[in-house]
Regions:
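Solvent-exposed soluble domains appended to multi-pass membrane proteins
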Residues: 1-163
Length: 163
């Protein structure tokens, strides 16, 4: 935490606009339903849903120069992030590009931003809808979008030059 504080303090002093994205890693597996965490009092949640194990804390921060250049409050509001802040890590980069005004440059990232507005959290066992509902059932349209996302992800990784 001290290292992050030192980094932010240094970036605050810069006249150049800077946006910092910092994120951690999900919790390791410690028994069915993460029983060890509950027994240790590590989680404040009464129930452990299928997404909790994969939560990754993240921070998106801007120095004053970036906040002014981007109209930060309006830019953050336009992201339409869920109230609970949950967002799949695979959507974080696209959200940052949108936050910094770089929409329309890539059909891939535009697709990711469209998908994250509908399904901000995608995990193999569960999904979180935009209203915060956690489900393992998708509509046909949502399932088709997830299939497209997975296929496009594969081809983007393997072939790099696909639109």
């Amino acid at each position: 935490l001290q290292a992050l504080t030192t980094l932010v303090q240094g970036l605050e002093e810069m006249e150049e606009p800077v946006v910092l994205v910092f994120f951690g890693d999900h919790l390791p597996y410690l028994g069915d339903n993460q029983l060890a965490y509950a027994e240790l009092g590590f989680t404040a949640r009464a129930e452990w849903d299928a997404l909790t194990s994969y939560e990754t804390p993240y921070v998106i921060w801007a120095n004053d120069a970036a906040a002014q250049a981007l109209d930060w409050e309006a830019a953050v509001a336009s992201l339409d992030l869920p109230e609970d802040g949950r967002l799949s890590a695979s959507f974080l980069g696209a959200a940052v590009l949108e936050l910094t005004g770089r929409t329309g440059e890539s059909p891939w990232f535009d697709f990711l931003n469209q998908l994250r507005r509908e399904l901000p959290v995608v995990q193999k066992q569960a999904y979180q809808l935009a209203d915060g509902t956690v489900t393992d059932q998708l509509t046909e349209e949502q399932a088709a979008k997830i299939a497209k996302w997975r296929q496009w992800s594969y081809y983007k990784l393997m072939y790099k030059e696909i639109d």
